[in-house]
Amino acid sequence: MKRMMVIASLLLAGGLAYVMWPAENQDRQTASMTTNVSSVMTDVILPEVLSENALIGKRAFEASCASCHGTNAAGQGGVAPPLIHKIYEPSHHGDESFQRASALGVRAHHWRFGDMPAVEGITRGEVTFIITYIRELQRANGIH
């Protein structure tokens, strides 16, 4: 009886560990579930006019972020999530969240794309402009 309890406990612990730390398998799982890896994940309504700072941010985004997060931050299936999404509204992911993610990387916690690495060679100032660009896109899409 004691032996069965030990075996059951080990199986339960192993199952919990698998559920709690799935990040290692996420990239493979997502890639196998995605037929068109570069597909746009959301339609983005563009604002009629971007501020000067947002235009600077757009250029920086295109150079440092778009290869993963897609054109106009629309995301790419199997690669990275859209930033024009309610999850990234300012009340949930404030501006400092973007600063920290770009500087330090971030562990996957909303999406199944795996962890985001730190962005090499980008300054805090450039990220500030990128945030301005993302926030203006978000507002044009009803995310406040």
Predicted regions, residues:
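Histidine/glycine-enriched, metal-chelating micro-motifs
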Residues: A8, G75
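C-terminal capping alpha-helices of c-type cytochrome domains
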Residues: K2-M5, L11, G15-E24, A118-H144
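Short cysteine/histidine-rich zinc-coordinating motifs and their immediately flanking basic loops
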Residues: G77-P82
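Sequence/structural segment immediately N-terminal to covalent heme-attachment motifs in c-type
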Residues: L50-A74, H93, S97-L104
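Extracytoplasmic electron-transfer domains, predominantly the class I c-type cytochrome c fold
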Residues: I84-L137
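Electrostatic cytochrome c docking/interface patches
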Residues: Q29-A60
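Extracellular/periplasmic low-complexity linear segments
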Residues: Q26-D27, H92
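Activation segment of ePK-like protein kinases, specifically the conserved APE
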Residues: A73, V106, Q138-G142
